[in-house]
Amino acid sequence: MAALSNEQIIEAIRGKTILELSELIKAVEEEFGVTAAVPVAPVAEGGGAGSVAAEEQTEFTVVLKGLAEPGKKIAVIKEVRNVISGLGLKEAKDLVEGAPKTLKENVSKEEAAKIKESMTAAGALIEIS
Protein backbone atom coordinates (compact mmCIF):
# COMPACT_ATOMS: atom_id res chain seq x y z
CA MET A 1 0.00 0.00 0.00
CA ALA A 2 1.34 3.44 -0.92
CA ALA A 3 1.96 5.85 1.92
CA LEU A 4 -0.53 8.70 2.15
CA SER A 5 0.74 12.26 2.29
CA ASN A 6 -0.31 14.56 5.13
CA GLU A 7 -2.47 16.51 2.68
CA GLN A 8 -4.32 13.34 1.63
CA ILE A 9 -4.97 12.41 5.26
CA ILE A 10 -6.23 15.91 6.07
CA GLU A 11 -8.51 15.87 3.02
CA ALA A 12 -9.95 12.49 4.09
CA ILE A 13 -10.59 13.80 7.61
CA ARG A 14 -12.16 17.02 6.30
CA GLY A 15 -14.99 15.00 4.73
CA LYS A 16 -16.01 13.29 7.99
CA THR A 17 -18.80 14.25 10.39
CA ILE A 18 -18.11 15.03 14.03
CA LEU A 19 -19.48 11.64 15.06
CA GLU A 20 -17.22 9.86 12.56
CA LEU A 21 -14.21 11.86 13.82
CA SER A 22 -15.02 10.87 17.39
CA GLU A 23 -15.10 7.21 16.36
CA LEU A 24 -11.81 7.66 14.45
CA ILE A 25 -10.11 9.11 17.54
CA LYS A 26 -11.29 6.17 19.65
CA ALA A 27 -10.03 3.70 17.04
CA VAL A 28 -6.60 5.40 16.91
CA GLU A 29 -6.41 5.40 20.72
CA GLU A 30 -7.17 1.67 20.82
CA GLU A 31 -4.85 0.79 17.92
CA PHE A 32 -1.82 2.58 19.34
CA GLY A 33 -2.59 2.31 23.06
CA VAL A 34 -2.63 6.07 23.60
CA THR A 35 -5.13 8.60 24.86
CA ALA A 36 -6.07 12.04 23.58
CA ALA A 37 -6.52 13.28 27.16
CA VAL A 38 -4.33 16.20 28.11
CA PRO A 39 -2.06 15.39 31.05
CA VAL A 40 -2.82 17.49 34.10
CA ALA A 41 0.04 19.03 36.03
CA PRO A 42 -0.06 18.36 39.77
CA VAL A 43 -1.27 21.26 41.87
CA ALA A 44 1.27 22.67 44.31
CA GLU A 45 0.03 22.51 47.87
CA GLY A 46 0.54 25.02 50.60
CA GLY A 47 1.16 28.47 49.23
CA GLY A 48 1.28 31.69 51.17
CA ALA A 49 -1.52 33.90 52.36
CA GLY A 50 -1.60 35.46 48.90
CA SER A 51 -2.23 32.18 47.08
CA VAL A 52 -5.29 32.13 44.87
CA ALA A 53 -8.06 29.64 45.60
CA ALA A 54 -8.58 26.80 43.14
CA GLU A 55 -8.84 28.13 39.60
CA GLU A 56 -12.34 28.34 38.22
CA GLN A 57 -13.08 25.90 35.42
CA THR A 58 -13.36 27.73 32.08
CA GLU A 59 -13.98 24.88 29.63
CA PHE A 60 -16.83 22.43 29.97
CA THR A 61 -18.03 19.22 28.33
CA VAL A 62 -21.73 18.71 27.60
CA VAL A 63 -22.84 15.06 27.77
CA LEU A 64 -26.16 13.61 26.62
CA LYS A 65 -27.06 11.09 29.34
CA GLY A 66 -30.33 9.91 27.81
CA LEU A 67 -33.98 10.84 27.41
CA ALA A 68 -36.06 12.34 30.22
CA GLU A 69 -39.15 10.94 28.50
CA PRO A 70 -39.11 8.18 25.85
CA GLY A 71 -41.75 10.05 23.79
CA LYS A 72 -39.37 13.00 23.30
CA LYS A 73 -36.83 11.10 21.18
CA ILE A 74 -37.64 12.90 17.91
CA ALA A 75 -37.46 16.34 19.55
CA VAL A 76 -34.11 15.45 21.13
CA ILE A 77 -32.73 14.21 17.77
CA LYS A 78 -33.78 17.50 16.15
CA GLU A 79 -32.14 19.52 18.92
CA VAL A 80 -28.92 17.46 18.67
CA ARG A 81 -28.77 18.48 15.00
CA ASN A 82 -29.16 22.14 16.05
CA VAL A 83 -26.38 21.83 18.64
CA ILE A 84 -23.92 19.95 16.40
CA SER A 85 -23.95 21.69 13.03
CA GLY A 86 -23.37 19.46 10.03
CA LEU A 87 -24.63 16.33 11.77
CA GLY A 88 -26.88 14.17 9.61
CA LEU A 89 -30.18 12.69 10.74
CA LYS A 90 -28.78 9.16 11.04
CA GLU A 91 -25.75 10.33 13.02
CA ALA A 92 -27.97 12.36 15.36
CA LYS A 93 -30.30 9.36 15.85
CA ASP A 94 -27.34 7.06 16.55
CA LEU A 95 -25.92 9.57 19.03
CA VAL A 96 -29.23 9.83 20.93
CA GLU A 97 -29.76 6.05 20.94
CA GLY A 98 -26.17 5.44 22.05
CA ALA A 99 -26.32 7.76 25.08
CA PRO A 100 -24.39 8.59 27.14
CA LYS A 101 -22.47 10.52 24.47
CA THR A 102 -20.49 13.75 24.45
CA LEU A 103 -22.25 16.51 22.54
CA LYS A 104 -19.66 19.29 22.83
CA GLU A 105 -16.25 19.59 24.45
CA ASN A 106 -14.23 22.59 25.60
CA VAL A 107 -17.12 25.07 25.53
CA SER A 108 -17.61 28.12 27.72
CA LYS A 109 -19.83 28.00 30.78
CA GLU A 110 -22.41 30.18 29.03
CA GLU A 111 -22.51 28.01 25.90
CA ALA A 112 -22.74 24.82 28.00
CA ALA A 113 -25.67 26.30 29.96
CA LYS A 114 -27.38 27.35 26.72
CA ILE A 115 -26.98 23.85 25.24
CA LYS A 116 -28.24 22.23 28.46
CA GLU A 117 -31.28 24.51 28.50
CA SER A 118 -32.26 23.81 24.88
CA MET A 119 -31.61 20.06 25.14
CA THR A 120 -33.50 19.78 28.45
CA ALA A 121 -36.45 21.65 26.94
CA ALA A 122 -36.46 19.08 24.11
CA GLY A 123 -36.59 16.22 26.64
CA ALA A 124 -32.95 15.20 27.10
CA LEU A 125 -30.99 14.45 30.26
CA ILE A 126 -27.81 16.54 30.12
CA GLU A 127 -24.70 16.62 32.30
CA ILE A 128 -22.09 19.38 32.25
CA SER A 129 -18.63 18.53 33.52
UniProtKB/Swiss-Prot annotation:
GO terms of biological process kind: translation
Top-level taxon of the source organism: Bacteria
Cellular component GO terms held in the UniProt record: cytosolic large ribosomal subunit
GO MF assignments: mRNA binding; structural constituent of ribosome
InterPro entries xref list: Ribosomal_bL12, Ribosomal_bL12_C, Ribosomal_bL12_C/ClpS-like, Ribosomal_bL12_oligo, Ribosomal_bL12_oligo_N_sf
Keywords: Ribonucleoprotein, Ribosomal protein
Segments forming a coiled coil: none
NCBIfam families linked: L12
Family: Belongs to the bacterial ribosomal protein bL12 family.
Subunit record text: Homodimer. Part of the ribosomal stalk of the 50S ribosomal subunit. Forms a multimeric L10(L12)X complex, where L10 forms an elongated spine to which 2 to 4 L12 dimers bind in a sequential fashion. Binds GTP-bound translation factors.
Function recorded in the entry: Forms part of the ribosomal stalk which helps the ribosome interact with GTP-bound translation factors. Is thus essential for accurate translation.
Descriptive protein name: Large ribosomal subunit protein bL12
Organism name: Treponema pallidum (strain Nichols)
Organism placement in taxonomy: Bacteria, Pseudomonadati, Spirochaetota, Spirochaetia, Spirochaetales
